[in-house]
């Protein structure tokens, strides 16, 4: 089969004659119909390339084989799933391939009315937003009984941002977001209560006023010095918690001792060690896998009843051969408020 793998000289290369993965108990083999790109796909190959390992995290396809113990799915089912490419522990894990393996518990059935190109955009957003909001080192919010408390999502128009907005609404919180004014309507369509222009030099202070100096929780989906400073300005005088999706700037982290600041690696949802160098490595976190099992079962239900929807997508043609162009666009910051999606087969 064809697959996009880590090249020995860096970046990705298109490989032919890659062997199909061997199924493990509790896993499903899928004929991939569409894949979505994420900033993670560019960063991981640039900073932690694993030559010969499959790339990609998000795919949708048709189940062609089930492993021992699988009960939720059968051959012929349409599913989407999250996996994590560039995995030194399992080079056959990844989405950028004609046949991909996923675990039963981190996969969802696709509703009849949803296309593969729409569905493939959801897996990583579900995993990342869920961990960031409801687990440690995330914000550890309750999944029920938010009682209208405001939670700030910095980067509300990102794929993780729009999923987080929806999760917050379901859990009973009030999502407050930052975004470009051109994306206000988008964020509001996902459930944002109010949007603030992150370009404004008084953005953080304005949010603090709007939230009555009581804001306690911030999810930063952008993560740079300016967004972290803005988030710290927004959190009320009693302090709170800040979680980011990237390593956080230490020159801002300790400017307020009443704020607990941390960041997470979404691959920890697998429950196995994240074998990356330095701060990007993570020990095994079985509790994240247990949460992921619970979350993806809920997400399947929410998707079926219309409680959540996918982020806007941009469909690009060319299949696996063209993915590297999309990765370059992500590197250059040319993709805003949408996910790039590539159909692989009819």
Swiss-Prot record:
Regions crossing the membrane: none
Stored InterPro entries: ADH-like_C (IPR013149), ADH-like_N (IPR013154), GroES-like_sf (IPR011032), NAD(P)-bd_dom_sf (IPR036291), PKS_ER (IPR020843), Trans-enoyl_RdTase-like (IPR047122)
GO molecular function terms listed in the Swiss-Prot or TrEMBL record: nucleotide binding; oxidoreductase activity, acting on NAD(P)H
Entry binding sites for NADP(+): 40-43, 157-160, 180-183, 198, 245-246, 335-336
Regulation: induction: The fujikurins gene cluster is specifically expressed during rice infection.
Keywords associated with the record: NADP, Nucleotide-binding, Oxidoreductase
Alphabetical list of Gene3D superfamilies matching this protein: Medium-chain alcohol dehydrogenases, catalytic domain (3.90.180.10), NAD(P)-binding Rossmann-like Domain (3.40.50.720)
EC number(s) per entry: 1.-.-.-
Positions of substrate binding: 124-131, 266-270
Taxonomic superkingdom: Eukaryota
Recorded family membership: Belongs to the zinc-containing alcohol dehydrogenase family.
Known role: Trans-enoyl reductase; part of the gene cluster that mediates the biosynthesis of fujikurins A-D, secondary metabolites playing a role during rice infection. The polyketide synthase PKS19 acts with the trans-enoyl reductase FFUJ_12240 and the polyketide transferase FFUJ_12241 to produce fujikurins, however, the biosynthesis pathway has not been identified yet.
This protein's name: Trans-enoyl reductase FFUJ_12240
Source lineage: Eukaryota, Fungi, Dikarya, Ascomycota, Pezizomycotina
């Amino acid at each position: 089969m064809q697959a996009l793998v880590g090249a020995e000289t860096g970046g990705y290369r298109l490989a032919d004659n890659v062997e199909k993965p061997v199924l493990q108990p509790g896993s499903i083999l899928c004929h991939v119909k569409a894949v979505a790109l994420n900033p993670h796909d560019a960063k991981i190959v640039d900073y932690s390339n694993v030559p010969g390992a499959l790339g990609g995290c998000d795919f949708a396809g048709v189940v062609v084989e089930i492993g021992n113990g699988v009960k939720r799915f059968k051959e012929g089912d349409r599913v989407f799933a999250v996996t994590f490419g560039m995995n030194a522990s399992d080079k056959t894990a990844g989405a950028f391939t004609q046949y991909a393996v996923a675990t039963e518990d981190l996969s969802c059935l696709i509703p009849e009315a949803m296309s593969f190109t729409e569905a493939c955009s959801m897996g990583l957003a579900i995993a990342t937003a869920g961990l960031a909001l409801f687990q440690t080192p995330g914000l550890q919010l309750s999944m029920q009984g938010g009682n209208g408390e405001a939670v700030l999502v910095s980067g509300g128009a990102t794929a993780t941002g729009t999923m987080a907005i929806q999760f917050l609404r379901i859990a009973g919180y009030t999502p407050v977001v930052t975004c470009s004014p051109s994306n206000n309507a988008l964020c509001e369509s996902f459930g944002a209560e109010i949007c603030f222009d992150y370009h404004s030099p008084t953005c953080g202070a304005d949010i603090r006023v709007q939230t009555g100096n009581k804001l306690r929780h911030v999810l930063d989906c952008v993560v740079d010095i300016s967004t972290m400073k803005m988030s710290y300005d927004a959190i009320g005088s009693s302090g709170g918690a800040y979680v980011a999706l990237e390593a956080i700037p230490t020159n801002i982290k300790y400017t307020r001792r009443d704020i607990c600041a941390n960041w997470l690696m979404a691959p920890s949802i697998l429950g196995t060690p994240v074998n990356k160098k330095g701060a990007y490595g993570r020990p095994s976190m079985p509790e994240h896998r247990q949460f992921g099992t619970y979350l993806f079962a809920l997400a399947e239900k929410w998707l079926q009843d219309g409680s959540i929807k996918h982020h806007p997508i941009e469909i690009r043609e060319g299949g696996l051969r063209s993915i590297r162009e999309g990765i370059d666009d992500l590197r250059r910051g040319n993709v805003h408020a949408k996910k790039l999606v590539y159909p692989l087969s009819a």
